[in-house]
């Protein structure tokens, strides 16, 4: 069996260290930095010939820098004769640009990034809760999309919930919310119907479902500015919800997210560590982070040992 090696870019060093600890190995010795003109500099400082190499790198903000860092690391490892290279991308940037809207003259940037990674020598991709599952089909290499939402579900099950109801913040999240509701005591589900006048600006219209005197669990794959989430929580409280908890895998938290969450009526926001939090977000009393290190470490171990990934999620 080829020797397994784990390398990390600069996007999520803390999660990378946690994963390495769970696998009882050290992170690979690589210098990943910048030249004086800002160009990316990578040097692999150990032998990787024939090794089964995993590179941990979320392509979060600064998205383009992190993508290029990953790409340059892949090229360096490929030229150093690594046996197999798996890109472990907990958060896949550009995932919301996965389609053309009618006849709009816009790119499908998720496909562009997938083509880029496939063409430079990535043999496999491991990612978490893709915004759109069809993105897996954009790649010319195998993609394992694991479910970080199950880590969130474990936290939900440990709460002392009073008459809970799972709430989808929009029509597009109904499938996700229904799956969580089924696993959460097969509870009821509500849907928030909203209109989005322009990107990152949303207006709550009405709630489909009875949320009065209930603990509401808002579930989504990501939180960006938090505007949608905070307005959803206000609408739920106005309709009589007792408590509102928000769960999301990817904490993008861009723009006015800190201000929005600070003023929000949400009782608690629970996210995963696919993206590092800025200090002003991390210090908010109503934001809590769960780690995916254990899940990702097990997925990496299974890939390296040619074992089933889907078996991790069989109940």
From Swiss-Prot:
One Pfam family from the record: Pribosyl_synth
Cofactor(s) listed in the protein's UniProt record: Mg(2+)
Keywords noted in UniProt: ATP-binding, Cytoplasm, Kinase, Magnesium, Metal-binding, Nucleotide biosynthesis, Nucleotide-binding, Transferase
GO biological process: 5-phosphoribose 1-diphosphate biosynthetic process; purine nucleotide biosynthetic process; ribonucleoside monophosphate biosynthetic process
Predominant location: cytoplasm
Top-level enzyme category: transferase
The protein's name: Ribose-phosphate pyrophosphokinase
Organism for this UniProt entry: Buchnera aphidicola subsp. Schizaphis graminum (strain Sg)
